[in-house]
Amino acid sequence: MREEIGFFQPRDAPRLRPSHSGPSCRQGMTAPAPPFFRIGPARPVSPVVLSIPHAGRDYRPELVSAARLPQAALETLEDRLVDRLVWRATANGATAFIARAPRAEIDLNRDEREIDPALIAPPLPAGGLVQSARTRGGIGLIPSRITGLGPIWRERVTRAEFDRRVGTIHRPYHAALEAALEYARVRFGAALLLDCHSMPPRPGAAGHGEAAAASVIFGDRHGTTTSADLLDAAVTAARALGYRTACNAPYAGGYVVARHGRPQRGIHALQIELDRALYLDADLRAPGPGFEGVCRLIAAVARALEERLLEIPDAIAAE
């Protein structure tokens, strides 16, 4: 069963339409669905690019039938409804790239080499692959296990299917991010990728003050993917709205920011993790009372980053 991505747009929001990348239709032929939605103007008006890699909900029947677990279990891997949180930021000019494929099919926040070779039939050559705690824990490029539920797949993934997922989903997504960031850098002098994720509820995160756990985590891989002043701008914007923040703990940023963040070239990358209790209902399935507030949070962070980015070329010129 497929669930098309819906964009949460209150009545006062401008009506946004996804701009699809991909081949055009010719002579009545239907073009294949692109691996992502692109939201934003064809000619970017902001140096901020948003990435939402874990909110895809296009569960192909073939994928669901290949799983030994029900679709509801596969959905627990999602960053639930994070795609619907970015409408205010895109209405303000940011460009967003939103994955269509669910994380269960392929994890866009993993290196394409970060996979258990035994998951593929015939097995991939071990040389050149990246083995990590994530692959050993079943959450590599293609997730293989869900904690508490066991193995996901009835059989190993064929090499042809593995190559299809990498070639038609993973690589095009990252190529699109790279192109958008480079375009923004050339046009504005600097660019930033804000990689948007959500995390399981943290005890105390719904509270305020020093005793409350941080509900918004920013990650720049310990200062390697963005400048300190940009991180400070994001933190300041979130705290101004009353959110408690932390940096790099427990989430320092994943493959997306590591791959695309090149501060020395004027391309920065910052991960934001949002406690799901902030914006979902008690069942963590549907929008909750705080949903619109988190939409405003992301927009405020994106705007603060944009303002600081636009100052960077002037600062360099003044040196």
Report residues per predicted region:
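N-terminal catalytic or cofactor-binding beta/alpha core of small enzyme domains
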Residues: 25-193, 198-268, 274-319
